[in-house]
Curated annotation (Swiss-Prot):
PANTHER family: GOLGI MEMBRANE PROTEIN YIP1, PROTEIN YIPF5. Residues 75-106 are annotated as: Interaction with Sec23. Residues 146, 195-196 are lumenal. Interacts with the COPII coat components Sec23 (SEC23A and/or SEC23B) and Sec24 (SEC24A and/or SEC24B). Interacts with YIF1A. May interact with RAB1A. Interacts with YIPF3 and YIPF4. Keywords: Cytoplasmic vesicle, Endoplasmic reticulum, ER-Golgi transport, Golgi apparatus, Membrane, Protein transport, Transmembrane, Transmembrane helix, Transport. Signal peptide: none annotated. It is a multi-pass membrane protein. Ubiquitously expressed. This is Protein YIPF5. Pfam families: Yip1 (PF04893). Residues 1-124, 168-173, 218-236 are cytoplasmic. It is found in: Golgi apparatus, cis-Golgi network membrane; Cytoplasmic vesicle, COPII-coated vesicle; Endoplasmic reticulum membrane. The chain crosses the membrane at residues 125-145, 147-167, 174-194, 197-217, 237-257.
């Protein structure tokens, strides 16, 4: 045993002593209760103290931005990307620029040569009526056995271009090509009546010549009246009516022969 004691005392020389453990005490019955335990020189009795509310710092809501205060923005009304509903969308004909009221007024202006023309309406670029009248004119020629659609469209394009250049030289305000095509197309309506007569009767006699001359004067007078009303060309109706008569005279020759 003396050898074992010597080995035990010489193994791992340290200052630790078993007798020192009895000196450490745990106070379970003191005034601090279970929260006043002292262990390894640390005092945990301070954790249960009461802190007054006025001494606590208020916490601010995190806004996602560093060192920037929270800004209050007024509520905004959401703006719709498209129309709120299909009921509030404009009709398809209005989006295409087709107004049947204006088409009817222009048609009545052509059918009544002595009626005053509304310059604001006639200055619009409306090609729905002229296209319909050109198709109707070609259809009546087809009923008479004359397939002249190419001549009708070609002469119409050349005539509109010539009148466009002439009116821009004569007027102070100028005119668009669409307006010229619209007016000349609407004034083609009496020529449809002439081609309709050619389906039933022959226009190569004296009666046909008089009727053809009347239709040419009707078309040219209506077109010149509309042009001087829309472009404020007072006193120049005869100068405008002459080239219009030449253009409608070509359509009359197609209808007669």
């Amino acid at each position: 045993m003396s050898g074992f004691d010597n080995l035990n005392s010489g193994f791992y020389q340290t200052s630790y002593s078993i007798d020192e453990q009895s000196q450490q005490s745990y106070d379970y019955g003191g005034s601090g209760g279970p929260y006043s335990k002292q262990y390894a020189g640390c005092d945990y009795s301070q954790q249960g103290r009461f802190v007054p509310p006025d001494m606590m710092q208020p916490q601010q809501t995190y806004t996602g931005q560093i060192y920037q205060p929270t800004q209050a923005y007024p509520p905004t009304t959401p703006q719709p990307f498209y129309g709120d509903s299909f009921e509030e969308e404009p009709p398809l004909l209005e989006e295409l620029g087709i107004n049947f009221d204006h088409i009817w007024q222009k048609t009545l202006t052509v059918l009544h040569p002595l009626r005053a023309a509304d310059g604001s309406i006639m200055n619009e670029t409306d090609l729905a009526g002229p296209v319909v009248f050109c198709l109707a004119f070609g259809a009546t020629l087809l009923l008479a056995g004359k397939i002249q659609f190419g001549y009708v469209y070609g002469i119409s394009a050349i005539g509109c271009l010539g009148m466009f250049c002439l009116l821009n030289l004569m007027s102070m305000t100028g005119v668009s090509f669409g307006c010229v095509a619209s007016v000349l197309g609407y004034c083609l309506l009496p020529m449809i009546l002439l081609s309709s007569f050619a389906v039933v009767f022959s226009l190569q006699g004296m009666v046909g010549i008089l009727l053809t001359a009347t239709i040419i004067g009707w078309c040219s007078f209506s077109a010149s009246k509309i042009f001087i009303s829309a472009l404020a060309m007072d006193g120049q109706q005869l100068l405008v009516a002459y080239p219009c008569a030449l253009l409608y005279g070509v359509f009359a020759l197609i209808s007669v022969f």
